[in-house]
A protein has these predicted regions:
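Domain-level signal for soluble alpha/beta catalytic cores
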Residues: 1-304
Length: 304
C-alpha cells in the first residue's frame, strides 16, 4: 500500500478582516505595530487550521507576496528592495531586491517596513511542530528576480548567497526546508547540493526536466516536487520521496479527496514507489480565504 502524505506551502490569501486592516494602515488609519500583531495572529490561526486538517508538512502561511524574498533580502542586502518589477509575463508585481555588492550575512531587519517595501509582522511564525517547514526562495530564483549591479559576477553572487543560506540554516536550526524555485536557470546551480546536505529539503522547481537537474550519488533533496505527471518521473528518480501537485489552486472547484488519492496511488504504483507527497499547484493566494481553507481541509484528507 502506497503511503500518501500532504504538503501545503507558500502564499495564502488574507482574511477579509486583515485585508480591510491593511487598507486602513495604508491610509495611516491603523498604526504599524497593530497591523503587525493582526497579521501574526492570522498566521497562527492558519497554522492551527493546517494542523487540525491533518496536513503532514506545511510552511509559514505567507500573506504578502514580498515575503517570498523578504528574509534573504533583509538579511543580506544594504538596500533590500528597489524598483517595482513584473514577475515574468504575469499581472503580479513585486519590489525587486537590489544587489549592489556581494551579499554578506547580516542581522534580519524584521521591523523595517513601509507601504512601498513590505507589510509589518514577524518574518516567520512557527508552531514549533514536527510538521513545520521553513520557507526559502531558491538561490537561482532570488538572483533572477533581483537587480544585479553590472560590475558584479553572477556566479560569485550566487556563491555568496549560498554561504548565507548555509549560515542561516545552521543559526536557526532549520531541520526542514521548503526551497521554492519558481524562476530557475536552465542549468542547475551546483551549490544546491550543499543545501540538500544541510537539512531535509522539499524542493519545488518549476519546469523540471532531466536536463535541468543534475545527479549526484552522495546527496539530493529529500523530496522533489513535480508540477505534472511528466515531471513526476524525474522527481521520482532524483529524490527519496517524490511529490506531485495534484490540487488546482487556481480555481474555486473543490476536489474530491478520494479521487486525488486514487490519482496519487496510480502514479506511484506505476513507478513502484512506497511513498508519495501530494500538494497543490502554484499557491492559494489567488483564491478567496474561505475557499482556500476548504481546499486545505480536502488536502488534509488526501494524506494518510
Amino acid at each position: 500500500m502506497v503511503k500518501i502524505r500532504s504538503i501545503e506551502y507558500g502564499l495564502y490569501p488574507r482574511s477579509e478582516h486583515v485585508r480591510l486592516s491593511i487598507s486602513k494602515w495604508e491610509r495611516n488609519a491603523l498604526d504599524h505595530k497593530s497591523l503587525g500583531k493582526l497579521m501574526d495572529a492570522e498566521k497562527k490561526e492558519i497554522l492551527k487550521l493546517f494542523n487540525k486538517s491533518g496536513i503532514n508538512f506545511y510552511t509559514d502561511p505567507l500573506i504578502n507576496w514580498q515575503d517570498i524574498l523578504r528574509m534573504v533580502a533583509s538579511l543580506s542586502l544594504d538596500t533590500p528592495f528597489e524598483k517595482i518589477s513584473r514577475y515574468r509575463e504575469t499581472n503580479t508585481f513585486y519590489r525587486q531586491p537590489l544587489v549592489e555588492s556581494y551579499p554578506r550575512m547580516g542581522e534580519i531587519r524584521e521591523e523595517e517596513s513601509t507601504p512601498d517595501s513590505h507589510l509589518p509582522g514577524s518574518m516567520y511564525v512557527s508552531d514549533n511542530s514536527d510538521h513545520y517547514m521553513y520557507f526559502l526562495p531558491g538561490i537561482e530564483s532570488f538572483v533572477n528576480m533581483s537587480f544585479l549591479s553590472p560590475e558584479l559576477n553572477r556566479e560569485r553572487v550566487m556563491d555568496s548567497f549560498l554561504e548565507i543560506y548555509l549560515d542561516l540554516i545552521k543559526k536557526h536550526g532549520m531541520k526542514r526546508i521548503l526551497l521554492f524555485e519558481p524562476y530557475p536557470d536552465s542549468h542547475f546551480y551546483e551549490g544546491n547540493w550543499d543545501i540538500f546536505g544541510s537539512a531535509q529539503v522539499f524542493y519545488v522547481r518549476y519546469g523540471l526536466t532531466e536536463g535541468s537537474f543534475s545527479e549526484r550519488k552522495d546527496s539530493g533533496p529529500f523530496s522533489l516536487i513535480a508540477s505534472n505527471e511528466k515531471e513526476f518521473d524525474v522527481a521520482a528518480r532524483h529524490s527519496e520521496v517524490p511529490g506531485i501537485a495534484l490540487m488546482n489552486s487556481q480555481n474555486t472547484y473543490l476536489e474530491n479527496p478520494e479521487k486525488l488519492r486514487k490519482s496519487a496511488t496510480k502514479m506511484s504504483s506505476s513507478l513502484k514507489l512506497d511513498e508519495i507527497f501530494v500538494t497543490h499547484t502554484e499557491y492559494f493566494d489567488f483564491l478567496p480565504h474561505v475557499i482556500a481553507n476548504k481546499k486545505v481541509e480536502i488536502l488534509g484528507k488526501v494524506g494518510d
